[in-house]
From Swiss-Prot:
Gene3D superfamilies documented for this protein: Phosphorylase Kinase, domain 1 (3.30.200.20), Ribonuclease Inhibitor (3.80.10.10), Transferase(Phosphotransferase) domain 1 (1.10.510.10)
Biological source species: Arabidopsis thaliana (Mouse-ear cress)
PROSITE patterns listed in its UniProt record: PROTEIN_KINASE_ATP, PROTEIN_KINASE_DOM
Domain notes: The protein kinase domain is predicted to be catalytically inactive.
Protein name from the UniProt record: Inactive leucine-rich repeat receptor-like serine/threonine-protein kinase At5g24100
Signal peptide limits: 1-21
PANTHER family with a match to the protein in the record: OS05G0588300 PROTEIN, PROTEIN KINASE DOMAIN-CONTAINING PROTEIN
Keyword NADP: no
Compartments, record wording: Cell membrane
Keyword flag ATP-binding: yes
Record topological domains on the Extracellular side: 22-251
Entry membrane topology: Single-pass type I membrane protein
Domain Protein kinase: 341-611
Record-stated family: Belongs to the protein kinase superfamily. Ser/Thr protein kinase family.
Length: 614
């Protein structure tokens, strides 16, 4: 009996420690991934911080890191354009055994191909393009049975293209362009391959039959024999004469001049027609449903030309021309190329440019403001971006990054899927998802914006571009203001298009130059915003000339029809009449014609918070 009890005791003890060890192993996986990432970070040069906070969760706060749906393992690492330099520390990334996607392109990484990456058996896509890796590639890829994308373009790899690529039977995309591969191309029988680029190497021989379907352009810039498209034969004038097709040299010269004249004439006509069409398009630009940012942004070739500018200012900033400049704390990791290829949805057009919703490679969604008519120098633009980017307040939408090149000026913000205050106030109708805003939500919008503006004013700055389309809701459910400081970068707003009229409708009467905004003029614009929120009326309404909310509200009040001012949605709310009147009085005081008679934002915040408490 004693022996039986001992057996049961040890068996239970075995189960306890065994299950504890198993539990420790399972829960330790994410900790192991975390340590692998930290070992990678601590052993590689990274002039720009990756913002991997050791005290915060890996899966939700570390830029570039993606975990599985349960948050137990790291499955993707996206660090393109993250300013990583040097050799990848061995035994770091390769410890992420559940990794499926690895993107380290557009950095300054060097050394041989990281052989330990072949240990990543779950890998589906790897992108190491646009770095400085060198040497030959491994020959055996038997462990990469799940790989679909292999992108090694623009490095310094050499040697022959491995015949082992033929074992990557799931491969869909293979890019080895702009390296120094030599020798003949192996016969890669990969029926699932859809994209291939072997251009600009030192390859010789002919194109294998299995790869001819990709066309000659996929193999250009090599020493290959193109059997299906031989180069045109060069026929001398003597041979032409022998065949009875001799034309004298003066005649040829005359024909050439005539042809050139016709060509130049046609080109001139085409340019003029395109210019006229472009001018008309800019005046009545339609709202596209979806487009690529690449259609509007410069190519890498165009951006690279900026480095050749002789301007001293350009030379000083040469190292930053093709970069996305991030601010501290930005939970993003991408470069200009990511923006060029990002899927983009047009959100709206304002007087300072157009806004897009962009989906990045790692599925993160951002809002990109493409600025237009920037008149300041690059130095002044960057200075203003630094000022705006360093405004830190929960009620001011943070500027996450910006791009400053000769061709483009871009600002990157977090994308708000709920939409702006303008959209939520004036959405088309209920069947399109528009839900009328209740009293509490409108009040919290105004409290948040007031606090954000108050903070901006304490920095001796003015916002200058307050309107409902620039107001969003933060994570705490209060208003948040975006796009501060833009008027300083452009010419005065005087145009009569709809976007300009909306800005001018919010403008204080004393402001004759939109670049000369003040805290007092911000308060006037905020007063318009409050009246818009209380009345539910769009300042542009259905009429081209819109309405003057201040005049309309004062007119209604003077006729003692104050109750007619408020949006019906607010009137239906019980027990808020006194609060509505108090907020209306605050709005009208903010829109006083004399700046000195307007309350400051401290007083505005106090009044709004008092209304909320009551």
């Amino acid at each position: 009996m004693s022996r039986g009890r001992s057996f049961i005791f040890y068996f239970v003890l075995f189960l306890f420690f065994g299950s504890s060890a198993l539990y420790s192993q399972v829960t330790g996986d994410l900790a192991g991934d975390r340590q692998a990432l930290l070992d990678f970070l601590n052993n590689i040069i990274h002039p720009r911080s990756l913002a991997w906070n050791t005290s915060s969760p890996v899966c939700t706060t570390w830029p570039g890191v993606t975990c599985d749906i349960d948050g137990t393992r790291v499955t993707a690492l996206h660090l393109p354009g993250a300013s990583l330099l040097g050799v990848i520390p061995p035994g770091t990334i390769s410890r992420l055994s559940e990794l499926q996607i690895l993107s380290l392109r557009s950095n300054g990484l060097r050394g041989p191909f990281p052989i330990d990456f072949l240990q990543l058996k779950k890998l589906k896509a790897i992108s190491l393009g646009n770095n400085r890796f060198s040497g030959p590639l491994p020959s055996d890829y038997a462990t990469w049975t799940n790989l679909t994308v292999l992108d090694l373009y623009s490095n310094r790899f050499n040697g022959s293209i491995p015949a082992g690529f033929a074992n990557l039977t799931g491969l869909v995309s293979l890019n080895l362009a702009k390296n120094s591969f030599s020798g003949e191309i192996p016969d890669l029988n990969l029926p699932g391959l859809r994209r291939l680029n072997f251009s600009n190497n030192n390859l010789t021989g002919s194109i294998p039959n299995s790869l001819k379907r990709f066309g000659n352009s996929a193999f250009s810039g090599n020493n290959l024999v193109f059997e299906n498209a031989p180069p045109p034969a060069v026929v001398s004038f003597k041979e032409q004469k022998k065949n009875g097709i001799y034309i004298s040299e003066p005649a040829i010269l005359g024909i050439a001049i005539s042809v050139c004249f016709v060509i130049f004439f046609v080109i001139a006509v085409v340019i003029i027609v395109c210019y006229v069409k472009r001018q008309r398009k800019s005046e009545t630009e339609p709202k596209p449903d979806k487009l690529k940012l690449a259609k509007k942004m410069p190519s890498e070739k165009e951006v690279s030309k900026l480095g050749k500018e002789k301007n001293i200012e350009d030379m000083e900033d040469k190292s930053e021309i093709n970069k996305v400049m991030f601010f501290e704390g930005s939970n993003l990791a991408f470069n200009l190329e990511d923006l060029l290829i990002a899927s983009a949805e047009f959100l709206g057009k304002g007087v300072f440019g157009m806004t897009y919703k962009a989906v990045l490679e790692d599925s993160k969604v951002i809002a990109v403001k493409r600025l237009k008519d920037i008149v300041v120098s690059r130095k002044d633009f960057k200075h203003q971006m630094e000022i705006v980017g360093n405004i830190k307040h929960e009620n001011v939408a943070p500027l996450r990054a910006y791009v400053c090149s000769k061709e483009e000026k871009l600002m990157v913000y977090d994308y708000d899927s709920n939409g702006s205050l303008s959209l939520r106030l004036h959405g088309k109708n209920a069947d399109e998802g528009h839900v009328p805003l209740n009293w509490e939500t409108r009040l919290r919008f105004m409290i948040g914006v007031a606090k954000g503006l108050g903070h901006i004013h304490t920095q001796n700055l003015a916002h200058g571009n307050i309107k409902s389309s620039n107001v969003f809701m933060n994570s705490e459910g209060y208003g948040c203001i975006s796009e501060a400081g833009l008027p300083l970068l452009t010419n005065p707003v005087v145009r009569a298009d709809s976007s300009a009229r909306s800005v001018l409708r919010y403008r204080a009467p004393e402001v004759t130059d939109t670049r000369r905004s003040t805290p007092e003029s911000d308060i006037y614009s905020f007063g318009i915003l409050m009246l818009e929120t209380l009345t539910g009326r769009s300042i542009m309404d259905d009429r081209k000339e819109g309405i003057d909310l201040v005049v309309w509200v004062n007119d209604v009040i003077s006729k003692q029809w104050t109750g007619e001012v408020f949006d019906l949605e607010l009137v239906k709310t019980p027990n808020v009449e006194a609060k509505l009147l108090q907020m209306l009085q605050l709005g009208t005081s903010c829109t006083a014609m004399v700046p000195a008679k307007r309350p400051d934002m401290v007083k505005v915040v106090e009044t709004l918070e008092e209304i909320e408490r009551d």
